[in-house]
Curated annotation (Swiss-Prot):
Amino-acid positions noted as binding ATP in the UniProt annotation, renumbered to this chain: 258-265
Function of the protein: Acts redundantly with KIN13A to modulate cell wall synthesis and cell expansion via the THE1 pathway.
Example GO BP: regulation of cell wall organization or biogenesis
PANTHER family: KINESIN-LIKE PROTEIN KIN-13B, KINESIN-RELATED PROTEIN 6
Source species: Arabidopsis thaliana (Mouse-ear cress)
Source domain of life: Eukaryota
InterPro entries: Kinesin-like_fam, Kinesin_motor_CS, Kinesin_motor_dom, Kinesin_motor_dom_sf, P-loop_NTPase
Residue ranges with Basic and acidic residues bias: 580-594
Protein name per its UniProtKB record: Kinesin-like protein KIN-13B
Gene3D superfamilies: Kinesin motor domain (3.40.850.10)
Gene (name only): KIN13B
One Pfam family it belongs to: Kinesin
Amino acid sequence: MSGRQRSVAAAVHHQRQLSDNPLDMSSSNGRWLQSTGLQHFQSSANDYGYYAGGQGGGGQAARGYQNAQRGNEFFGEPTTPQYGARPTNQRKNNDESEFSPGLLDLHSFDTELLPEIPVSNQLDGPSLFNPSQGQSFDDFEAYNKQPNRSRVLAENLAAEKERMNAVAKIKVVVRKRPLNKKESTKNEEDIVDTHANCLTVHETKLKVDLTAYVEKHEFVFDAVLDEEVSNDEVYRETVEPVVPLIFQRIKATCFAYGQTGSGKTYTMKPLPLKASRDILRLMHHTYRNQGFQLFVSFFEIYGGKLYDLLSERKKLCMREDGKQQVCIVGLQEYRVSDTDAIMELIERGSATRSTGTTGANEESSRSHAILQLAIKKSVEGNQSKPPRLVGKLSFIDLAGSERGADTTDNDKQTRLEGAEINKSLLALKECIRALDNDQGHIPFRGSKLTEVLRDSFMGNSRTVMISCISPSSGSCEHTLNTLRYADRVKSLSKGNASKKDVSSSTMNLRESTKIPLSSALPTPSNFDDDVNEMWTEENDEFDASDYEQDKQMWKKNGKLEPSYNGMAQERIPKPTIQMKSRDMPRPDMKKSNSDDNLNALLQEEEDLVNAHRKQVEDTMNIVKEEMNLLVEADQPGNQLDGYISRLNTILSQKAAGILQLQNRLAHFQKRLREHNVLVSTTGY
């Protein structure tokens, strides 16, 4: 037995020397064994009984060489031939210049069967390479020096990691808040049921005969949090998994979306502080002495303009660099090293943020607030250079979306703010839709908000969306719009299962087409507003494929199917609704004109403020010139004619500047009156 082991060890040692070019051999396995002096290896392999009888010695030696490379044991089923073994009569032994197909198959099988190797049980049983049987650890060198094995394992792990990252690129979480006092006073009911990562909305509708019925809408997301979930659990579910990734050159973003008063600010407020604690802990322990630094910045987007919340609302400018990366010029960043400083900065910025009272919420956020935690690393050996950005974690508290019907008691300025908010949210939705459809052009420049969020959806990024919904029956339409919006975002994540509501949403569209007056019976005074509002929301969900399917239902044998049963009233309005869908460009044209007017008003406002600022600067220069003139007038021997001439010139300059500013102001007032924005002209 010891002689047989020595012969096998010698065979393995000799094969290791030839492993650099294992295919450079003769096709005749018997001649190959003779040339290497391994004639006795054939009998040794037969004694182990690993191959079935009748096989040639060359095939057995090749199998022994394969198992020597893999480090497998020669125990198990002794009479069972290995899968894929070829008889010797199929091998080409005539021409010595040709390779043996058996040896070529060994290498292909080696790569194919690699994941099936039971590594954990390598040293169990009577293995030929077990050191307890008298052999040294040098015999393992042939097994350890296998670049193909490690390369395949590395490629498999990299591919698996890439697949996991692709699935988790965008995570959508829905949070349901409890009923508030205002909703409880109105006796509104909770119409949202949550279970695991699913939720169901029970929408109450009316048929044509005013019979009430309940329609269920089911949605599936990555996580659904009910009203009992605390902010700590929200953080563990949403932000905590992405915090370690920002040290790996990844930009992560967490933003909250929902109607005004749905709890977005309440949800987002504690998340940055909790994330900063974890970041500092990683910097001080896991990445200690690696030069990482934490910087905090806080700004808002109000009325299409950027303001620094940590520098007394200083106005900022957004620019793009040569790499098409968004840069905010003038944004103040504060380096922090403890959570107390971060808490102070967050409280100071939150107190400066623009808020207002609307018909739907007494403390509504009227701006999009962006808090950024940037990880930077100092340049080694050169402390004079600024640190380079490694990763970034952004928290975006979006302003609440609102409908025109909810803002009837708001003033003109609040309505103007709401129009700008809805415009930016619509631009964000268009970007998400373009990404979902794999379009070549993504309209990120539709608003300032989408420009800021560009790096959140492009490149190596991670995004967490928290959709906040209200459970009350009075906010059912808002809730469904928010959930459909979140489902659109979720569709960006490849391989997701959040398409559960596709069939129900298609049924909802058909149902609304059948009974257009089932949702409500508006009064004549509000009918036009409700129709415009209905088309604003329905146009986003309209699909030509659904129309074609409905068209097949209308027709039977090339004609409209006559029916005089109880469903006749539901079939009659369909052509009317279809005629309205043909007129869809009209509301789009009206909406585009409204956006153009809004942009023009905002631009004129900015021009007026800049003109006023320039007038103040010119006035200060004129005042300095007047003071110098008075000093010269007090000097003895001053010429009176020169004093009068210079004074006349100064007064003319002052009058011309004031007149020009008054004309610009009067023109701007006229434009505001045309668009019914100014409530009164008091104070002008």
